[in-house]
Amino acid sequence: MGSFSMGHWLIVLAIIVLLFGAKKIPELAKGVGKGIKTFKKEMEDETPVEKIEKADSETQSTKQNETTKNV
């Protein structure tokens, strides 16, 4: 019940071809590929921002410690 057989996948593929047409499928696949590539690139770009946020939080905690010492 949990997995599809080859026959099920062929039926799904036939329905997709009927809905979108044979010419549109490569364009759709290309769009999905670009979306995945962009998503992965953005995920890699997140790392420097996280490092900056971590450095900012460490700076703020240092300032709080200095303020506490001055009081």
Swiss-Prot record:
For biological process, the GO terms are: protein transport by the Tat complex
Q: Which GO terms describe its cellular component?
A: TAT protein transport complex
Quote the subcellular location field of this record: Cell inner membrane
Q: What is this protein called?
A: Sec-independent protein translocase protein TatA
Top-rank taxon, per record: Bacteria
Q: Does the keyword 4Fe-4S apply?
A: no
Give the protein's function: Part of the twin-arginine translocation (Tat) system that transports large folded proteins containing a characteristic twin-arginine motif in their signal peptide across membranes. TatA could form the protein-conducting channel of the Tat system.
User: Any coiled-coil ranges, and where?
Assistant: none
Outline the segment boundaries, as ranges, of region: Disordered: 41-71
Q: Mind telling me which PANTHER family this protein's record contains?
A: SEC-INDEPENDENT PROTEIN TRANSLOCASE PROTEIN TATA
TM segment ranges: 1-21
Q: Which family does it belong to?
A: Belongs to the TatA/E family.
Predominantly, its location class is membrane
**Key words of the record:** Cell inner membrane, Cell membrane, Membrane, Protein transport, Translocation, Transmembrane, Transmembrane helix, Transport
The answer on whether this UniProt entry bears the keyword Aminoacyl-tRNA synthetase reads no
State the species of origin.
Campylobacter fetus subsp. fetus (strain 82-40)
Q: Which HAMAP family match?
A: TatA_E
Give the matching Pfam families: TatA_B_E
